[in-house]
């Protein structure tokens, strides 16, 4: 419709062109007589088919890659492309580059030991001439909160003892949702941090949406919260209607909440169907307000997330991004549960006061340079730090629950940890 193509379209249409038009494939086979491909383990199926077409005439093809670093199957990468190269080109020559120049021998030997459990791989033995280095330390924690505190306290101690900087530390986790407990612990120690390639926990859209419902429950006159969620999840109250309501509330010198509870008193020119939707929304929020003094923060927030439709809206999105957003909501509720278990004053209003302090820190503009780096293991590929923590190494977290259904997926989790 837009006369445009995304990256996948470009690949698929290139393949169709080469497959269906003999003059096109002949032209490009003669044009590209030598083909070199880097990071071959990350290629997907259609890229593989394009490569096969282009290389078929001359078979002058050189691929570079490491099957043990194939960690992007969720993007369509096929480890079989590199594993089966020898079958596609029987006259191939293989050169193994096994010396590691970056890591200590302790890390190299541990990684070799780990990846050795994978059956589906090209056999190799990585080695290094580097020093032995420090031992890898394994810590057991009772909960994610304990783990966050342990990481923050250890960073604080090493910083003082070794006279190093926050930028020398990285904390890696399997999913973005795991950052919450780490972020909260670092903030309590006043240790600056940044989320690499993403937003801090309380800046993520789905978290802001749930908290906006909570803010409106505590204070119905919070107009920013009301405007954010009056039509989310979608309930048929469009932007035009919202703008009309804002104008009326401003000219009548009343709050938006007061207006939408007394619409029949004002000349609004909003159709009956939309008025009915607005009434349903106010009834929903009033039901939350009625519980704010007699239910704890966890119970009420979970009820809000489910009754508002927000929980279902995210649950039904099965894309990788949707799954990540749903995990973030679950992690927010875990945080609320921790709050209720550790505080006698555990009403939603008390929790929101604590969260306000955390989100205010997010809004402070600070330099990104000298901060602890928090990121997923996927995002860490290719980076290095003097001190690294890997958190959440437990069944169904890392390795992921999604990996438990097949040997292939479990081996990818092992490659990811490698």
Summary of predicted features, one role per range:
Residues 65-68, 75-79, 99-101, 111-112, ...:
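A short beta-strand-to-loop transition that corresponds to the Sensor-1 phosphate-sensing loop
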Residues 30, 49, 109, 113, ...:
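Generic recognition of well-ordered alpha-helical segments
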Residues 179-191, 204, 211-418:
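Conserved helicase C-terminal RecA-like lobe
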Residues 68-75, 102-103, 196-218, 230:
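Short alpha-helix plus adjacent loop in nuclease-associated cores
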Residues 70-73, 103-109, 116-117, 123-124, ...:
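Switch/connector loops and helix/strand junctions flanking conserved nucleotide-binding motifs
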Residues 90-93, 98-192, 215-219, 251, ...:
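Helicase P-loop NTPase motor core
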Residues 57-60, 66-68, 89-94, 132-136, ...:
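Short glycine-/polar-rich loops that comprise or flank the Walker A/P-loop
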Residues 1-84, 99-103, 304:
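Conserved helicase NTPase motor core
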């Amino acid at each position: 419709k837009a006369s445009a193509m995304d990256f996948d379209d470009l690949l698929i249409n290139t393949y169709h062109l080469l497959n269906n038009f003999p003059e096109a494939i002949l032209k490009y086979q003669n044009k590209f007589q030598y083909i070199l491909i880097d990071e071959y383990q990350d290629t997907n199926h259609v890229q593989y088919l394009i490569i096969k077409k282009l290389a078929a005439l001359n078979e002058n093809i050189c691929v570079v890659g490491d099957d043990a670093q194939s960690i992007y199957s969720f993007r369509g990468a096929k480890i079989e492309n590199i594993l089966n190269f020898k079958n596609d080109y029987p006259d191939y020559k293989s050169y193994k580059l096994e010396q590691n120049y970056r890591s200590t021998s302790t890390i190299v030997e541990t990684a070799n030991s780990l990846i050795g459990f994978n059956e589906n791989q090209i056999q190799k033995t990585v080695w290094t001439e580097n020093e032995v280095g420090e031992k890898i330390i394994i810590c057991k924690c009772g909960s994610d909160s304990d783990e966050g505190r342990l990481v923050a306290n250890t960073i604080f101690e090493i910083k003082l003892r070794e006279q190093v900087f926050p930028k020398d530390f990285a904390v890696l986790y399997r999913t973005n949702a795991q950052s919450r407990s780490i972020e909260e612990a670092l903030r309590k120690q006043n240790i600056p941090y940044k989320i690499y390639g993403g937003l801090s926990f309380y800046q993520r859209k789905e978290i802001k949406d749930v908290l906006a419902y909570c803010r409106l429950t505590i204070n119905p006159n919070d107009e920013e919260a009301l405007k954010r969620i009056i039509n989310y999840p979608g309930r048929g109250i469009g932007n035009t209607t919202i703008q009309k309501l804002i104008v009326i509330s401003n000219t009548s010198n009343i709050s938006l909440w007061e207006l939408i509870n007394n619409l029949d008193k004002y000349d609004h020119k909003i159709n009956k169907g939309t008025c009915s939707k607005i009434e349903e929304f106010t009834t929903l929020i009033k039901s939350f307000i009625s519980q704010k003094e007699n239910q704890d923060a966890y119970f009420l927030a979970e009820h809000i997330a489910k009754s508002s439709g927000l929980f279902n809206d995210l649950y039904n999105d099965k894309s990788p991004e949707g799954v990540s957003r749903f995990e973030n909501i679950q992690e927010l509720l875990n945080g609320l549960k921790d709050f209720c278990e550790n505080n006698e004053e555990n009403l939603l209003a008390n929790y929101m006061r604590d969260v306000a302090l955390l989100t205010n820190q997010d809004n402070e503009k600070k330099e990104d340079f000298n901060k602890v780096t928090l990121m997923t293991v996927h995002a860490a590929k290719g980076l290095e730090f003097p001190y690294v923590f890997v958190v959440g190494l437990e069944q169904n977290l890392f390795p992921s629950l999604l990996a438990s259904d097949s040997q292939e997926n479990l081996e990818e989790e092992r490659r990811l940890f490698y």
